[in-house]
Amino acid sequence: MTKKMNVESFNLDHTKVKAPYVRLVGVTEGANGDKVHKYDIRIKQPNKAHMEMPGLHSLEHLMAENIRNHSDAVLDIGPMGCQTGFYLSLINHDDYDDVLTMIEKTLEDVLQATEVPACNEVQCGWAANHSLLGAQEIAKEMLNEKASWSEVF
């Protein structure tokens, strides 16, 4: 990495991080004082492992639907293109420990799920590409490593 790039994660040395972890990427303040907190929920070790798409896709649906049951501050949660984690954006919410609890409860919801929400051609752009069991396996692995979530390096 020779020059600073516009994208924060491109400035992160992916060879130094130790997944799984939950990292505050940054805080953006709007013109009216609202603050958006963006988190890197890294599930797999970069360049060593990744989530297979059907499980990741189902985990995305399950987390997007369920995390909002645990906080009104959620703006968005979505997968990284590298398939190693998710980004979570919250508005006016700066309690890191609460974020960890929110993620934990959401992953526990995934383990209890009996179906993937919005897993149909009307509500999803690739409805044939889902795996509830794959999502639950990823969630279980992440929960098993909860003690290390706040250790990035």
UniProtKB/Swiss-Prot annotation:
Enzyme class, spelled out: lyase
Binding site for Fe cation: 57, 61, 124
Entry cofactors: Fe cation
EC code: 4.4.1.21
Any one GO BP annotation for this protein: quorum sensing
Protein origin, superkingdom: Bacteria
GO MF term (any one): S-ribosylhomocysteine lyase activity
Keywords: Autoinducer synthesis, Iron, Lyase, Metal-binding, Quorum sensing
One Pfam family this sequence matches: LuxS
Keyword Secreted: no
Catalytically driven reaction(s): S-(5-deoxy-D-ribos-5-yl)-L-homocysteine = (S)-4,5-dihydroxypentane-2,3-dione + L-homocysteine
Co-factor remark: Binds 1 Fe cation per subunit.
Function summary: Involved in the synthesis of autoinducer 2 (AI-2) which is secreted by bacteria and is used to communicate both the cell density and the metabolic potential of the environment. The regulation of gene expression in response to changes in cell density is called quorum sensing. Catalyzes the transformation of S-ribosylhomocysteine (RHC) to homocysteine (HC) and 4,5-dihydroxy-2,3-pentadione (DPD).
NCBIfam families: PRK02260.1-4
Family: Belongs to the LuxS family.
Subunit structure: Homodimer.
Name of the protein: S-ribosylhomocysteine lyase
Source species: Oceanobacillus iheyensis (strain DSM 14371 / CIP 107618 / JCM 11309 / KCTC 3954 / HTE831)
Gene name linked to the record: luxS
